[in-house]
Amino acid sequence: MAEKRDYYEVLGVSKNATDDELKKAYRKKAIQYHPDKNPGDKEAEEHFKEVAEAYDVLSDPEKRSRYDQFGHAGLGGAAGGGFSGGGMSMEDIFSRFGDLFGGFGGFGGFSDMGGSSRRRVRRGSDLRVRVKLSLADISKGVEKKVKVKKQVVCSKCRGDGTEEANGKTTCQTCHGTGVVTRVSNTFLGAMQTQSTCPTCHGEGEIITKPCSKCKGEGVEIGEEVISFHIPAGVAEGMQMSVNGKGNAAPRGGVNGDLIVVIAEEPDPNLIRNGNDLIYNLLISVPLAIKGGSVEVPTIDGRAKIRIEAGTQPGKMLRLRNKGLPSVNGYGTGDQLVNVNVYIPESIDAKDEQAIAAMENSDSFKPTDAARKDIDKKYREMLD
């Protein structure tokens, strides 16, 4: 599957599907492509991983929100929580979602799969960073680097949690499977359920000689410089994830994600309104009367615009496609130029004479039509 499909399409649900609808859709698809039902079928196995990846994202409110905002780009190019490049291992999928299959249809989803057991795979916690972006960054997308303090794999035990090679023993409660199985008789017949082993907490092993540096946790505090790409069109408060760059998990689990929260830096000239940009242009009285050309700043430089003779304060000019791109790639906003006329608070004697001459000119006397036009615009603004 060279190109990722839409996750809602993968599960066959609408974009406003409820949690129950997602769970039912995932269960149906996963059973359809389950390896026990399709032994040796690589295509079915890939579909099985794909539906697990889709459910992992859409069943998590935060990941789903990022996916709805950014698409696959908001998940660091892959699904969150361990779906890296082509998906989780089969063992990871069964560990995370296997409880959805318990006692259903004759197979619980936990067959050996070539010798693997359903040991619990822990996940490291997510990290959050706030990244400030200029409008120029937002207009084109940008590469960023952040230095974070986080949990990393223990440098002494390499994440194993033991002081020496033979520092673990197989859990005697679950015999290394990480789960305990219970069989109960119901009117439908014998039902088998599985739950996490209470002794080893799903790991299948007990540490007898913990690492002296990490005390058996398999992690320590370290630093990492993380690089990531922020797509064009993001907005204040939006979030995206960098897959697997959060805290390391205890004893060889799945890393958490780095959650990047977008913060917009104020621009000295432009004001953002959705994907449109607004520039407040202040022109002189003579320019408003005579008309002429002026330059205005844009997101990528400057643009020359024409001021028509008799331009009124509040007139809005539009520069097509000079705004910001949509984060989902659907079109580009415009730049709006809000024209205002500068009225000086004081003038010198020479200017007073010029103003006095204009007062007697019919050209400078307000007309009833002009007043009605202002009245119409004001009423439209109030509606």
Curated annotation (Swiss-Prot):
| PROSITE patterns to which the protein is assigned, alphabetical | DNAJ_1 (PS00636), DNAJ_2 (PS50076), ZF_CR (PS51188)
Q: Where are the zinc fingers (CR-type)?
A: 141-223
What are the protein's UniProt keywords? Chaperone, Cytoplasm, DNA replication, Metal-binding, Repeat, Stress response, Zinc, Zinc-finger
Q: Which GO terms describe its cellular component?
A: cytoplasm
Q: Which GO terms describe its molecular function?
A: ATP binding; heat shock protein binding; unfolded protein binding; zinc ion binding
Write out the ranges of the repeats annotated as CXXCXGXG motif: 154-161, 171-178, 197-204, 211-218
Domain comment from the record reads as follows: The J domain is necessary and sufficient to stimulate DnaK ATPase activity. Zinc center 1 plays an important role in the autonomous, DnaK-independent chaperone activity of DnaJ. Zinc center 2 is essential for interaction with DnaK and for DnaJ activity.
Subunit details for this protein? Answer: Homodimer.
Its protein name is: Chaperone protein DnaJ
Identify the gene encoding this protein: dnaJ
